[in-house]
Amino acid sequence: MSGLLRRRRVFAAKVEATVGTAESLTAAEAAFNAEEFTIQPNVAITRRQGQGGFNYLPGIPEGMQGTCTVRFGMSYNGTTLPSWASVLLPACGWVATGLVLSPVTQGPGGAAGVKTLTIGEYKDGKLSILSGAMGTWKIIAETGKQAMIEFTFTGKYSTNETDIAILTPTYPTVLPIRVANGALTFNSVALCTASVEIDSGNTVTMRECVNASDRSGYVSAIVTDRAPVITANPESALVATQDRDALWLTSSAQAFSMQIGATGNSITIAAPKAQLENKQQGDRNGIMADDLTWLCTAGSSADTELTITFD
């Protein structure tokens, strides 16, 4: 028997029609340019002590869940939402209205459009699946490099691995957007950064239920809280240009906006009320920098603290 190759893998994901009920996956659901993805089961075994000596009886599996980590270059063709956004972000609580994705405070399956996913990892003749999955995301934008988004999903590990032929999808051909020729501002002042990270800050929990329709012990995952955070390392500025100590130490929330790419083929992440939570001195190859952390606080209404707009 030849060895199975780790690089020979395909990622697939599909929105579930019924929360927590696994969907069948086909090549159409694998039309992603996914990188560094894997599904890891997380199933504890309860040990059972035997009698008469130092021995144990066969253990009992507890709740059956797992995680999937996956990352994508942030591609966009300038017209329609890419699959990494239209399929995966609603399972993180960010729902699209046209080309704008906004956070929603609601469990999956409701009218607001929050979803759960069935996720498959096809790996050189085998398949692992999570169902009822929801997750959290983080955007990594390093200047001059492709913009990346990383997802971590949690879901039910309700079926064992199976042997199955690997899918052969038609992959997207649109290139990821480079972090260049864009715009980055805080309180209307341009920031010159080497790196920006934007973390959705979701708290994902499994919904235990004795009435669950499979062996897992869970209905699905659910997002129960979020605290979006932005970190960046802009060059330091004179106080006359931007008084960052004052912005930090007076609880002053101001607008943050980052446009990745040129207008007409760009992705903009906006936080209308970003509050500086920390400011430390940094060093970028001898250039004075400020290591900044913002919390995306409430905007003018609920669920407006952090939006993603495709232009």
Please name every model-derived segment:
Residues M1-D311:
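Signature of extracytoplasmic/envelope-associated structural regions
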